[in-house]
Curated annotation (Swiss-Prot):
Substrate binds at E71, A72. Phosphatase that hydrolyzes non-canonical purine nucleotides such as XTP and ITP to their respective diphosphate derivatives. Probably excludes non-canonical purines from DNA/RNA precursor pool, thus preventing their incorporation into DNA/RNA and avoiding chromosomal lesions. This is Inosine/xanthosine triphosphatase. Mg(2+) binds at E71. Homodimer. Its EC number is 3.6.1.73. Belongs to the YjjX NTPase family. GO terms for molecular function: ITPase activity; metal ion binding; nucleotide binding; ribonucleoside triphosphate phosphatase activity. It is an enzyme of class 3 (hydrolase). Transmembrane segments: none annotated.
């Protein structure tokens, strides 16, 4: 008996993002074989998005790029960014998911950032590099991320992306409720 296959393209080659997409889809579609592939996709926004708006647009741009490049059932893009809110600076990620002619946007949890980290970002650095320097790590953005470091491993960048993907999939799981 041949198993049904769902092909997923992720707008990044970062293993954290690819694994989050694969894990979320495996949870949502346990009776399917999930084939997940990452590809480089331009965000069209600064390398370190500093606003909610730029972060969201980066995810949308990546997902649209992927749709134009290769055939798949679902297209995922995750864009991490920072912004300064009324309660202080925080990092978060937007998730853009395309399926057929529909687009769903979701956002991961907000992680409060130390002011010294935010100031380094305002000066032009990227969050992963700042965290590597602060915690003496190497390429943390392809591992637990700032989330893993600041929560002492109780949450990770991947776990945040996985949850955000599952939530952003709601319109595709319940299409009758999202006309």
């Amino acid at each position: 008996m041949q198993q049904n296959i769902i092909k997923v393209i992720v707008g990044s080659k970062n293993p954290v993002k690819i694994n989050a997409a694969a894990n979320a889809m495996a949870l949502l579609f346990p009776d399917y074989e999930i084939q997940t592939q990452g590809m480089d996709a331009p965000s069209g926004v600064p390398a370190q998005p500093m606003t909610d708006s730029d972060t969201r647009q980066g995810a949308i741009n990546r997902v649209h790029y992927c749709q134009q490049q290769i055939e798949a059932d679902y297209y995922f893009a995750m864009e991490g960014g920072v912004d300064c809110f009324e309660f202080g600076p925080a990092t978060f990620a937007y998730i853009a998911i395309a399926h057929q002619a529909r687009l769903s946007i979701g956002r991961g949890a907000l992680l409060p950032l130390p002011m010294q980290v935010y100031q380094a970002l305002e000066a032009g650095e990227e969050l992963g590099h700042v965290m590597d320097r602060l915690f003496n790590t190497v390429n943390i953005k392809q591992k637990g991320g700032a989330i893993g470091l600041l929560t002492h491993g109780h949450a990770t960048r991947e776990s945040n992306y996985t949850q955000a993907i599952i939530l952003a999939m709601a319109p595709f799981l319940n299409p009758e409720l999202y006309p």
